[in-house]
A protein has these predicted regions:
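Secondary-structure transition/turn motif
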Residues: 72-74, 79-85, 127-137
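Generic alpha-helical structural element
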Residues: 90, 124-127
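N-terminal capping/interface segment
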Residues: 102-104, 117, 124
Length: 152
């Protein structure tokens, strides 16, 4: 485990990083980094934005320039590259743990498989409502915080 990560409160992420090969897409908007990629990404992040060192650990990306962060307190956060310079104020706290992030990712992967076979799935109001309910079941208010819209 990288020594910098020891001060972050997320035993499940620390275990996953050291025990598994995390380098894979867990759903369309989340690609987790393995140990080596995480170390490289965080060195770059902290070189460019030293004020984030010790406060945020980059765990993955969207593949489109946005990225997922673990905050020191264990919460998962998100940064939208369209906002420009990275500042703590530009980082959105999802108020979820790594385990909840994995639950969210598993659910979104399932939804994406459904959309692959039925692109009009969300045309049904009941499906939109079930989606919002599922995200809010993972964490209260998560549907409102989630940045990628599957329907509007």
């Amino acid at each position: 485990m990288p020594p910098e990560l020891a001060h972050f409160h997320s035993p499940s992420y620390q275990h996953a990083l050291t025990a598994y090969n995390l380098a894979h897409e867990i759903h369309g908007d989340a690609i987790l980094f393995d140990h080596a990629q995480a170390a490289r990404s965080n060195r770059q992040l902290w070189r460019d934005y030293p004020e984030l060192r010790g406060q945020y650990w980059q765990i993955g990306s969207s593949g489109q320039g946005d990225f997922w962060l673990l905050r020191r307190d264990g919460n998962i956060c998100w940064y939208d590259h369209d906002l420009g310079e990275i500042t703590p104020a530009a980082i959105v706290d999802f108020a979820i743990t790594f385990d909840q992030f994995l639950a969210l990712s598993a659910y979104l992967a399932q939804i994406e498989r459904t959309l692959d076979t039925n692109e009009h799935y969300f045309a049904a109001p009941a499906h939109r409502q079930a989606f919002a309910h599922a995200l809010n079941h993972i964490a209260q208010g998560l549907f409102a915080r989630y940045p990628y819209r599957y329907f509007d």
